[in-house]
UniProtKB/Swiss-Prot annotation:
It comes from Danio rerio (Zebrafish). PANTHER family: COILED-COIL DOMAIN-CONTAINING PROTEIN 43. Residues 127-213 are annotated as: Disordered. This is Coiled-coil domain-containing protein 43. Residues 119-206 form a coiled coil. The keyword Metal-binding does not apply. The keyword Metal-binding does not apply. Belongs to the CCDC43 family. The gene is ccdc43.
Length: 213
């Protein structure tokens, strides 16, 4: 049974304390026992290897007990590590699932955005076509196609007259607005001066009255 590396530290701490209690050199035998447990696949192979190591300094009556104790502790450490590993795997799987769902949402939103963009472009294109058709129709109405006749020339003249009148009206309205603005400004200045003059007169009357007293 090969062991994960993460359980080696926990088991090694326990093993070192147990070897110290047996007055066995932990520096020599600790790493040796740990290596055997990690390399041997079956429980029987592990037990035989442990007995071969520990028989050098343990009596026969305690050898079996110590071997069983070491194997039991090793198995428990492996089980706890497996549970932690499974929990970690479950957490990793949950995070991966969440990331996948978020990625799907982003893709779906992007697809919706693309669809909305396409619909918008289609509407704009349709509107542009309609506008172009209307503009062409207006141009056809304003500028008759074909050989100019007296009637078409008369229509063109009328259109120009209307446009000129509108331009004159706009210019006149602009000029009137500017004049009104200047008049209002002048009136405000007059009102301001009149108000100041009244204040000055009132002030002078007050000063005269005080001097008479």
């Amino acid at each position: 049974m090969a062991a994960p590396e993460q359980i080696a530290g926990e088991f090694e701490n326990w093993l070192n304390e147990r070897l110290d209690s047996l007055e066995v050199d932990r520096e020599v035998y600790g790493a040796y026992i740990l290596g055997v447990l990690q390399e041997e696949e079956s429980d029987e192979e592990q037990k035989d290897a442990l007995q071969g190591i520990l028989s050098a300094f343990l009596e026969e009556e305690t050898l079996e007990e110590v071997c069983q104790e070491i194997l039991k502790q090793w198995t428990e450490c492996c089980s706890r590590s497996g549970a932690k590993s499974n929990q970690a795997d479950a957490e990793v799987q949950a995070i991966a699932s969440l990331i996948e769902k978020q990625a799907q949402i982003v893709v779906k939103q992007k697809e919706v955005s693309e669809d909305a963009k396409k619909r918008k472009e289609a509407v704009l294109a349709q509107y542009a076509n309609v506008t172009d058709d209307e503009d062409e129709a207006e141009e056809e109405e304003q500028v008759p196609v074909g050989i100019p006749s007296d009637k078409s020339l008369f229509k063109n003249t009328n259109v120009e007259d209307v446009l000129n009148r509108r331009k004159l009206q706009r210019d006149q309205a602009k000029e009137d607005a500017q004049k009104k603005k200047e008049q209002d400004k002048m009136q405000r200045e007059k009102d301001k001066l009149s108000k100041q003059e009244r204040k000055d007169k009132e002030k002078k009357r007050t000063q005269k009255g005080e001097r008479k007293r």
